[in-house]
């Protein structure tokens, strides 16, 4: 539901989880086989967790932050964690990158560029719940 000023979208938890289930169906329908999931904290943690459980794949977490100003609604400088948290081993093979939102696309582009520079990753694809009309990452 959009606010009266049209600036904010409010989504119920039920709708949020339905969107995650739809995303899981899209990933499954793609037929792409992946080895691990990497979610971007904070927004990608819940979708990443659910997809990890549905597909029974290890979940890695990378912390990123750029929305700090104006109550967390204005994008600022992008900070990315130096390390990726994994339950065991390293991020490798075919990796599904998961986040909640591709807003400007800056975060996803920066993370993808960093991951593509990692020789242990053989293939990389992304899955997000929402993509804005101005995102440079699709």
Language model feature labels by segment:
Residues 1-138:
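PRPP-associated nucleotide enzymes
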């Amino acid at each position: 539901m959009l606010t009266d000023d049209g600036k904010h979208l409010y989504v119920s938890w039920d709708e949020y989880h339905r969107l995650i289930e739809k995303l899981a169906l899209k990933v499954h329908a793609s037929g792409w086989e992946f080895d691990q999931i990497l979610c971007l904290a904070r927004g990608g943690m819940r979708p990443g967790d659910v997809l990890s459980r549905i597909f029974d794949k290890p979940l890695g977490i990378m912390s990123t932050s750029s929305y700090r100003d104006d109550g967390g609604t204005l994008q600022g400088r992008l900070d990315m964690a130096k390390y990726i948290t994994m339950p065991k081993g390293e991020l490798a093979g075919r990796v599904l990158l998961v986040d909640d939102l591709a807003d400007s696309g800056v975060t996803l582009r920066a993370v993808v560029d960093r991951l593509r520079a990692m020789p242990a990753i053989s293939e990389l694809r992304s899955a997000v719940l929402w993509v804005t009309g101005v995102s440079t990452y699709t």
